Amino acid sequence: MIFHILFNYNQSRQVMDEKIQKVLEEKIHESTSRINEISTLVTSSGQDSPEEENAFGQGIIIGRLYNSFYYQSRRILKRNPTEQEFSEFIQLLKEHENELSSSFS
């Protein structure tokens, strides 16, 4: 009984469209697999230290993901994402934090 209540509670809290979530998952894997291109961008930017290069590279990846999230919300849902959907986007980034941060470590 408690599992059923918790399962339904978690299901009712998820607002992000499944299509958008799937696109974002694919974009995360695409971004981390194209690390050579992003590294070239980072290197050409002339950052002063490895820490700055790391932060800049992660910023590029997060920017790509945010752009996809916003664009897909507009394309699929025909509207801007809600605050709840944005919170779920942040949660998705947190779930993939190790994968995203290890790209530039």
Show the residue positions of the predicted features.
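Non-transmembrane, amphipathic alpha-helical segments
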Residues: M16-V23, P50-G57, E85
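N-terminal secretory signal sequences
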Residues: H4-F7, K22-V23, S49, Q91, ...
